[in-house]
Amino acid sequence: EEIEVLDLPATGGLSFRWRGCWPKLAMFKSRLLDGVDLALYLDLDVVIVGSLDPIIDHARKNAGLHILREWNPSIWGLVPLSWRPDRGGQSSMVAWRPGEQDHLFADVLADPEPAYKRWRNDQRYIQQKARDGHYFPPDFGISFRRHCVWHYPLNLIFRKVKKPKGPAVVVFHGKPKPSDLTRDDQSRWGTKYRYGFGPVDWVKAYWRRGLDAPKKVRAPADLDDQGRARHLSS
């Protein structure tokens, strides 16, 4: 498939605030996505394991901005979702209609310091400042470390990490990173109490497919005055 590459706009002082992922807000710049009726943002460190169609259909049918809900620590998984503390948004997956959320970038670019102090990171800011913000249904995206890896000591018994069948997107936040699960040795990965050893087949296959696939990228400079491709670079 051909991929059209668009340059992200200058982010001013936000470019120095990678802790908190503030430069990510450039995706909301006015007119950046002119002609696009719906945008679905995914972090690079996610693994897509199912069709994105239900996610896109949901965002089309329901107005506003949609964001994942941050997952709760293990013990809270034993109670209904409505009983769990709301930890705010998780911006590994966000959907919105371009033009409706331009203020998210404009406001923080105009006066960033109060936003840094009040919200501390991009996902709290997005979730709380979005116009008509909603959480995605919880089965659209899951956490790799919270939903796919057993807590110690059960992880020593159930060592095989199975590919989930329901959700479309598996999010890697914190440790481990997808690349940690592609090594051929039996090195340990993960957190203190949720960890494993060696490669995870389905993550490795997905990650390698992306690295090994021939790249056909359409850059802005490759388009003529009518928006047609002059050439494709590999």
Where do the protein language model's features map onto the residues?
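Active-site-proximal specificity loops/subdomain of glycosyltransferases
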Residues: 1-35
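Short, P/G- and charge-enriched loop/turn segments at secondary-structure junctions
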Residues: 14-16, 78-84, 156-158
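Short aromatic/hydrophobic "clamp" motif used to bind/position activated sugar donors
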Residues: 39
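The conserved acidic donor/metal-binding loop of glycosyltransferases
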Residues: 43-47
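Conserved donor-nucleotide/metal-binding helix-loop-beta segment in metal-dependent transferases, i.e.
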Residues: 48-86
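Extracellular/periplasmic catalytic domains that process cell-envelope and extracellular macromolecules
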Residues: 59, 86-88, 160-165
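Conserved core of the sugar-phosphate nucleotidyltransferase
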Residues: 81-97
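A glycosyltransferase accessory/donor-loop signature
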Residues: 96-234
